[in-house]
Amino acid sequence: MTLAASTPPSADGRDERPAGLAPLPEPDAIRFAVVDVETTGLDPAMTRVLESAVVELAADGHPLGEWTSLVSVPGEGELGASWLHGITRSMLSPAPPFRELAGELTAHLAGRVIVGHVLDFDLSHLAAEYARCGLVLPDLRRVGICTRELARSSLPPGPRSLVACCKALGVSCPAAHTALGDARATAAVFAAFLRMGVVPDPRAAAARAAALAWPMSAWDPLGPSCAVPRGSVGRGA
């Protein structure tokens, strides 16, 4: 893996990181969590997460695993741009509410460097959902990397949508506007940027991620998952 240096060592080899930061991890030990959410709208204070996904990557961008679930929301109202995200009320009927997924989602995010395309959008909606459960999501912007921002500095001028970035990098994007499809596409875009050597050295972000205080979770990683992936339900009306 080739990384762009962010905090070079001093002339005598000492690590000139800010005081108090945890020791930097070995590069090969870094793990990335690529996140995406589909929502009922744009304002996290007013709208809800309908689907969430995480793709875990190794330090070199190789996929290690993935997780996704639909999320039930209260009421019988509209679900936003259903024509775009394809989620219907009947699809959500077997899905758990966010409070039942929060522990499982936390287990897939904690300790990782968080990656997303327009990352602030995903993080703001997740923070709002955690808050509705009485939980505080740590400030993941401090341990996050936005692929749209990388595209702005690393690709020729042009659109910076996820689909446009995939096209510019020769990456497949077969399931756009599904949480898992977009997370997979973002992961592939990020892996391409890793190979290009344009990703700022993530070791400091990884050290901060390891030190974050996450909500306590009662979810047992050896127990059954309560996630309901999109592919396990019919679309219905």
Map each language-model feature to its residues.
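Conserved non-catalytic scaffold segment of RNase H-like nuclease domains
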Residues: 2-141, 156-176
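Short, intrinsically disordered, low-complexity terminal segments
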Residues: 1-2, 182
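Buried hydrophobic packing segments
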Residues: 126, 150, 186-190
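Acidic two-metal-ion nuclease catalytic site recognized across multiple nuclease folds
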Residues: 2-24, 188-237
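Short, flexible loop segments at boundaries between secondary-structure elements
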Residues: 144-156
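Acidic, divalent-metal-coordinating active-site segment for phosphoryl/phosphodiester hydrolysis
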Residues: 178-192
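Active-site flanking residues adjacent to catalytic metal/cofactor-binding acidic residues
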Residues: 35-37, 145, 181
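Short secondary-structure boundary/hinge segments and terminal tails
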Residues: 100, 148, 183-184
